[in-house]
Amino acid sequence: MAPQTNRKDLHLDAVLHHDMSMKKKTAGFESVEFEHCALPECDFNTIDLSTEFLGHRLALPFLISSMTGGARDAETINCRLAEAASELGIAMGVGSQRISLEESQHSGLGKTIRELAKGVPLYSNLGAAQLRDKGKLDNAQRAVEAIQADALFVHVNPMQEAFQKNGDHNWIGVLHAIEQLKPRVNVPIIIKEVGFGISGDVAQRLVDAGVDAIDVAGAGGTSWSAVEGYCQDNPHMQRAAELFRDWGIPTATCLAQIRAQHPKLPLIASGGIHNGLEAAKAIHLGANLVGQAGAVLKAATISTQLVVDHFEQMALELRLACFGTGSAKVNALTKARRL
């Protein structure tokens, strides 16, 4: 089994069967408290939860965020996620396509996933550090074409790589690679973190590089320091991974920083968002979409219906937050009053 494939299996085992969450740090949404509106002047049953993102209309402002399915179970997991996304009318991002491109393994990331995710946006995914390597920029368009994607996620994950055995430790030139990427792909480029967050300063550099959208993927949910520590056999790195378990910028902080500087930049909030109320708070802080990965992974290992049930519960809670703030449309949450 290839090293990358084995690592993906370890990731899956860690997230599904062990507590890989941050210990003390949260995503920061407890600091946002809506003011209750006793005269909402809207009908609960007709509240509009639909939204538009990068030119696509979505029934709900949700994204099935990029996640690893592991080599053994990737195809089943990705197919269930795609089926659920299509049924719900929400967007879906696939996990890293590095293995499928470099080792000729589909891992559920071929044309089938496009057929299952019919009628909804589907996003490709590659690591920024790998794109910097000579000759690898062309992999971006290959990744898009492999699944007929509507946009390309490029994940920036330096701290995860630092804790990873044989990870990409040299990040010199990564921003330049991102700048060079724009003319090589025919879809929008979305930069995302993996759970450590993107600051306002880094967002500015990314905007200057020409990216189309950002997924803040902030701290507060799964700790990828902890996950990589679990996968390590080096005791020094294991200890260091535990020390840095809570490293990162809370998701709410990322949103506030970036939205203040870029009022119109398409933003995705992910990282430590567990329910529809927290999704409402993320939208209030400026998110256009709300993504979940770890929170829905276990459901995806069981059935498509459980994934659908999960997001329908999220939608109910989001609708309640809209009603309680007098927001007839989900986008009106940006103007909801706070205590």
Swiss-Prot record:
Per the record, the major location class is cytoplasm
Q: Does the keyword Transferase apply?
A: no
Q: Name one Pfam family in it.
A: FMN_dh
Which keywords accompany this UniProt record? Cytoplasm, Flavoprotein, FMN, Isomerase, Isoprene biosynthesis, Magnesium, Metal-binding, NADP
Q: How does it assemble?
A: Homooctamer. Dimer of tetramers.
Protein name in the entry: Isopentenyl-diphosphate delta-isomerase
Q: Which cofactor does it need?
A: FMN; NADPH; Mg(2+)
Q: Which InterPro entries match?
A: Aldolase_TIM, FMN-dep_DH, IPdP_isomerase
Q: Which gene encodes it?
A: fni
Cross-referenced Gene3D superfamilies? Aldolase class I
Q: Which GO MF terms are attached to this record?
A: FMN binding; isopentenyl-diphosphate delta-isomerase activity; magnesium ion binding; NADPH binding; oxidoreductase activity
Which biological process annotations from GO are given for this protein? Answer: isoprenoid biosynthetic process
UniProt binding sites for FMN = 65-68, 96, 125, 192, 222, 293-294
Which residues take part in binding substrate? 7-8, 96-98, 160
EC numbers for this chain: 5.3.3.2
Q: Which HAMAP family does the UniProt entry name for this protein?
A: Idi_2
Tell me the compartments it is located in. Answer: Cytoplasm
Q: Name one GO cellular component term.
A: cytoplasm
Report the family membership: Belongs to the IPP isomerase type 2 family.
Q: Per its UniProt record, what SMART domains does this chain match?
A: IMPDH
